[in-house]
Amino acid sequence: MENLIHVQKTFEKIVYVDKKVNNREFEDCVFKNCDLSNSDFSYSSFMDCEFIDCNLAMTKLSGTSLKGVLFKNCKLLGIQFEECDDFLFNVNFEE
């Protein structure tokens, strides 16, 4: 995830706990069984992405753009969605 731009990638079983990975762009990406808890994704952009069975507890999303993002069966405890960029904000949640 070190690159700044990611398009049509699948991230599986990635452990990025307590990491600072802000100012990244993700388009049409899938995150499966990833642990991103307590990481900082501030000022990043997620467009048409899916998070499936991921742990996103306490993830920081300040100024982050979420457009067409699906969270399916994810742990989302403590995420401050109100701090996200509200322009075209569009998220869906499934169990």
Question: Language-model segments: which ranges?
Answer:
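Tandem repeat scaffolds
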Residues: 1-95
